[in-house]
Amino acid sequence: MANEVIKCKAAVAWEAGKPLSIEEIEVAPPKAHEVRIKIIATAVCHTDAYTLSGADPEGCFPVILGHEGAGIVESVGEGVTKLKAGDTVIPLYIPQCGECKFCLNPKTNLCQKIRVTQGKGLMPDGTSRFTCKGKTILHYMGTSTFSEYTVVADISVAKIDPLAPLDKVCLLGCGISTGYGAAVNTAKLEPGSVCAVFGLGGVGLAVIMGCKVAGASRIIGVDINKDKFARAKEFGATECINPQDFSKPIQEVLIEMTDGGVDYSFECIGNVKVMRAALEACHKGWGVSVVVGVAASGEEIATRPFQLVTGRTWKGTAFGGWKSVESVPKLVSEYMSKKIKVDEFVTHNLSFDEINKAFELMHSGKSIRTVVKI
């Protein structure tokens, strides 16, 4: 099959705002420096829903969504040297070419090698490997995991432990790695730190896990859905508060609770007003607030400059700061050695035909992560 077109099932998003449609598609063989992967499991993330809603300015249709997946290499194109058929892998939406100025700089993980074409839903050569009913179907985030087979650039693949359960470690392709890395890489919080985590979904829980691993003394969870508090405490939150229970702004509440403010705060929602509250909840002189949530296009953040002049820092993070190709295998190893949790994030398992139900569960707030077996 290596040099042949594969016919398989995929969940196609034909247009914005409509449910995904399970279709038979054709997946072309990998070209030079590309890898064709049989996807075994994928999760559904808020980013997929954001694009499907039509609000994403980079969203293009028709497209195969999905970026939290894991699978087995089916075949490789010419020039691929580090991967072979049969390898167990996680596709990566942030690649690591190892050669661009971003990859060569230890301060960032934002490889730009294929950014332009990836943003257009195309492979690095400017074309697609997917067709359905005679129409070209676009790629998504360089991964397109809502398909039995996908084709990705070889710099967008992490080779992982073949013993890892793919219906669990697929989550390391986005949300868990993002939150965990925000704490241990971006914030680099010290043991004994006091932290506040705004938004207790999957990413927020991963931040809590990272804070706990790093030795935080207090981890305060903040969410308007109190049903999320029990699970947050299981992950390591020492206390949880609901902003709706107070008559004053939540930053004032946190400043009072923590004798002047937290050492580190994390915004895991994508709400610019919450981003401001998270910054202003930080301690004068040294507090650091990390923006993890992705706000809608065109949104702007605001605060009084005095907040920054008096020693607070605003930072952002993407994929938790992990240089992807080299870091994801290590994260899988940390999971296998029980240093980090993954299983506990999975609240629902569905068949491929039920993929639209995964979006419904997410919008209802009833799931952390739903894993779809492909």
Curated annotation (Swiss-Prot):
Alphabetically ordered keywords of this record: Acetylation, Cytoplasm, Disease variant, Dwarfism, Intellectual disability, Lipid metabolism, Metal-binding, NAD, Oxidoreductase, Phosphoprotein, Zinc
GO molecular function: alcohol dehydrogenase (NAD+) activity; electron transfer activity; fatty acid binding; formaldehyde dehydrogenase (NAD+) activity; identical protein binding; S-(hydroxymethyl)glutathione dehydrogenase (NAD+) activity; S-(hydroxymethyl)glutathione dehydrogenase (NADP+) activity; S-(hydroxymethyl)glutathione dehydrogenase [NAD(P)+] activity
Chain positions recorded as Zn(2+) 1 binding sites: C45, H67, C174
GO cellular component, as recorded: cytosol; extracellular exosome; mitochondrion
PTM-bearing positions, type Phosphoserine: S247, S324, S351
Site (Important for FDH activity and activation by fatty acids): R115
Binding residues for Zn(2+) 2: C97, C100, C103, C111
Cell compartments where the protein resides: Cytoplasm
First-listed, main subcellular location of the protein, grouped into a coarse class: cytoplasm
Cofactor note: Binds 2 Zn(2+) ions per subunit.
Entries under InterPro entries matching the protein: ADH-like_C, ADH-like_N, ADH_3, ADH_Zn_CS, GroES-like_sf, NAD(P)-bd_dom_sf
Catalysed reactions listed for this entry: a primary alcohol + NAD(+) = an aldehyde + NADH + H(+); a secondary alcohol + NAD(+) = a ketone + NADH + H(+); S-(hydroxymethyl)glutathione + NADP(+) = S-formylglutathione + NADPH + H(+); S-(hydroxymethyl)glutathione + NAD(+) = S-formylglutathione + NADH + H(+)
Residues modified to N6-succinyllysine: K233, K315
Keyword NADP: no
Any single Pfam family the record assigns to this protein: ADH_zinc_N
GO biological process: fatty acid omega-oxidation; formaldehyde catabolic process; positive regulation of blood pressure; respiratory system process; response to lipopolysaccharide; response to nitrosative stress; response to redox state; retinoid metabolic process
Obligatory cofactor(s): Zn(2+)
Additional notes on this entry: There are 7 different ADH's isozymes in human: three belongs to class-I: alpha, beta, and gamma, one to class-II: pi, one to class-III: chi, one to class-IV: ADH7 and one to class-V: ADH6.
PANTHER family: ALCOHOL DEHYDROGENASE (PTHR43880), ALCOHOL DEHYDROGENASE CLASS-3 (PTHR43880:SF4)
Subunit structure: Homodimer.
Name assigned to this protein: Alcohol dehydrogenase class-3
Species this protein is from: Homo sapiens
